[in-house]
Each structure stands twice: as structure tokens, then as C-alpha cells.
């Protein structure tokens, strides 16, 4: 019965039967197939026991064959399962050849003839060939290389579709937003400026310093900005820049206690003034107290420190007074020069102002502090020690007014020029400048105590006169003489600075950093610090020589 039903079909008419690579299962006595239809051999007891019922599903036996188009029966002696009309090779992609990179695309959902793929001679369900997930090719904006590049401007502005999609797919009218591509490597085509633009939060390279470490600046964070465009609060350092604040912000900060005070120049001048006041007081206190000790047996009528008033010439007394003045200045300058500069002398203050080492405001503050410090030291020495207060300065030794003025002027010029070369000019031995300054005052006192009292300091002579209430007729020489001496020292300092004295004996300190012949930056600093510009000397040979 089964042979009569299927005698016109052949197993070789199916694609699987025609495929030589198909390997049928070794066991031919399988009880079932994928479709649930049993395979029964011809002339077997199972085949004889099956009743002939046309309505039943046909039973395929191995002896039966499917009719081929040529009418020849199959001679296969193994069971061949039926396959769908669409080949397995047509529904999976094949790799490309070795000579080309073209890959066969995946099979479409429909067969070549447009008909739905059906399973022949099977009663089971067939899974749809429709893809259940979207692949990378199903999305539009995923890589810049998928679009027509801007270099091919005709295709780009024609809005031509991608070549790996069907002809109905078009690129969208807008490019992807830049934040989607900011962290992606730039593409290899000419669209890199379009899809990978610079980060607007970072200034361009031509507007910022590329290597701040070379200039000694600290590194800034990635997104550096101030708290606002008006205030001056630096996030990196956390310091308040008072000069960069607006008037409204300053008024708001004024409400906080001591905020404006701690960020103003007034506070700095106040601290310098207090330091100068205390330093002058301590310097003159020890100097006046030592002078009191030296003049214990002196004449108490004149109350001066000159050699003539202290009785007969006593070298030991002159040496004692000179030593106490020199050492007192050395110690107190060494202590207070970090606070106020350790000037302790109105003549030195005027000289520093003339060479622009200090400002006018600072000079006025220091001058007042020095005068007050001299008066306080005089009060303390007068009422602290039981001896007579003999520390005023007057002319002695037969010196006239003119002689007294020039003695004070020359001695003050020596002291001021020593301060210029040891303290103002920065060098390797700047930190021991107080030693040289104290020794300069010591040798000046060795000469001046006998004839003028060795003042060299208007504040030193003014304080005792105020406390004793007696101003001598020659008191003015202790103001004019030191002022002239300061002017002499300033003029000579300008002269050697204009001629670049550093080049006359380079390397005298043994410091290559301050040697202009070995350090170009020091050479430029010397040329920039000339007190008189070269243009003031005119032009021509003179200007070239001085420059």
C-alpha cells in the first residue's frame, strides 16, 4: 500500500538526497524522525501488521522510493529524511574567498522565488526565519566610517545612503551630537573636525601655556575656573586676592572680623612700623645703657658723650662706647631685618627711599617709628639706671660747626654705603650683612665720639634732647650731616650701578648664580636695574659706550 502511494517519488529528488556530502545516520532502525513519522522496512512484521487505511498518514519504507522526474527508482538502502525545499546552504552566510574581503550577506527572510519556505512531507511546526534581535547594521549612527565622508562632498550633500544598507535607507539630516563622540578616537577620514571637535572647556593651545612646569607654575586641574568672573578666589591655592575683588565684594567681606585688615597694605605697614619701633628701642636702649656705664665718673654738668665733656681723653671709654653701639646695632638688625628691614636710622631710611628700595608710605611709617623708639629708649634708660643721664651729643675736641657737619656726613656715608652693598645688593653673604653693618658703625664711632659724639643717626640725637628738655644750638648738624652723607652714598651707588660694577670683577663671591658672565638672567637683571636710562645720555658713541 505504501509502495503504491509513493511509487512516483524518489528520495534523490530532494536536495538532501542530491547532496553528496550528506551523511545519513548509521542506525537505520530508528523508531522515529524529527517529524514523528516511523520508518519501517519493507517485508518486515511491522509492515505486514499495518492495516490498509487510505486516511492514515503514509508510512515510508526503505524499499519504497519517491518518483523522480526521470522515472528511475532509488537504489539507496538507507533511510533518507525529507528536507525543506530551501537548502541549508542558502540560509547561512558563507565566508569570503582568500583573495577578497566580500562576505556573502545573510539570507533574506524569503526564498529566491518569493515563496514562503515550507517543510515538505512533515507535520511538525516550522520556526520562522525572521531575526529576533537587531544587529549592528540595523542602526544608523554608530560609526563615522558608515557615512559618506565630507571629502566626497557631492555624495555628502546629496544625502546619499550607506553602501552596506538597502537603497531606501538614508543618513539622517543631523549628525550625532558631539558628546556621543567626545571620548572616541578620531576617525581616519576628513570628518574628524566635525565629529571630534576640541573640548570647549579647555582653552586652545595657542592661548595657554603648554608647559607650566618650565615657568615654575603649579599645575591646574582639568576644568579650572574661578568661583565667578568678578571675585578673585583661587580654587587651586585657596587664597583671597584682595586687589582682584570688586567694591561690593570688599564691602561684604568687611563684615567678617579682621578680613580686610589681614589682606590690606595698611596691615603690612603697621607690622613693619611696630617692628621698627621695637627694634630702634632695643638698639638705643643697649647703646645708651652702655654709654651710661662708660660715663659713670664723667662730668655730669654737660650730660654729653663727647670726649671733651667726659674729662680727659680716655681711649678705653671711647672703645667701650664704640663697641656697645656697634654690637647693639649688629644684633638688633639681625633680629628685626625680616620684619621691617632693621634700619633704625632716619638717614638710612631716606637713602633707601632714594634708591627706591622702599615706598614713600613705608618710609614715613619707619621714620615715625624710629623717632618714637628713640624717645622710649631714652625714657627707659633715664629712669631705670641710677646714674646721671649722659647720652646727648654735642661738638667737642675743638671741632667747628662745619667740621662737625662733614664728620657726620662722611661717617654716615660709610655706614649707608655698607648697607647698600651688603643688604640691598643680594649675594651669597646677604644673610651675614648685619655683621658688616655693625662693624661699620663700630669704626665710625671710634672716630666720631671724640669730636661729635658719633651720632650718625638723627633719632639717636633727637630722643635724649626731648627727654632732657635741652636742645643745643648745634643740634641741627645731627640732621644735616647724616642727610648729606646719605646723599653722597646714594650718588656713588647710582654711579657704580650705571657702569655695571658687577662686570668689573665677576665671580668675586664665588657664586655662579650671581655671576653675570655665567648667568644670562643675572646679566639681564643688571641691565634692567640701571637707575638712569641710557637714553638720558643722548645718542651716538656715548650712548653705545654706556650701554
UniProtKB/Swiss-Prot annotation:
Comment block on domains: Aquaporins contain two tandem repeats each containing three membrane-spanning domains and a pore-forming loop with the signature motif Asn-Pro-Ala (NPA).
Extracellular topological intervals: 291-316, 385-400, 450-475
Homology family: Belongs to the MIP/aquaporin (TC 1.A.8) family.
Species assigned in the record: Gibberella zeae (strain ATCC MYA-4620 / CBS 123657 / FGSC 9075 / NRRL 31084 / PH-1)
Gene Ontology terms: cellular component: plasma membrane
Positions with biased composition (Polar residues): 1-13
Entry annotated with the keyword Methyltransferase: no
Principal location class: membrane
Motif NPA 1 mapped to chain: 345-347
UniProt catalytic activity: H2O(in) = H2O(out)
Protein name: Probable aquaporin-5
Keywords: Glycoprotein, Membrane, Repeat, Transmembrane, Transmembrane helix
Residue numbers covered by motif NPA 2: 457-459
Segments in the Cytoplasmic topological domain: 1-269, 338-363, 422-428, 497-547
Role played: Probable water channel that may have redundant functions with FgAQP3.
Glycosylation sites: 302, 314
Region named Disordered: 1-208, 510-547
Record's compositionally biased regions (Low complexity): 15-32
Keyword Acyltransferase attributed: no
Entry-linked InterPro entries: Aquaporin-like, Aquaporin_transptr, MIP
Gene disruption: observed consequences: Leads to no variable phenotypes.
Membrane topology: Multi-pass membrane protein
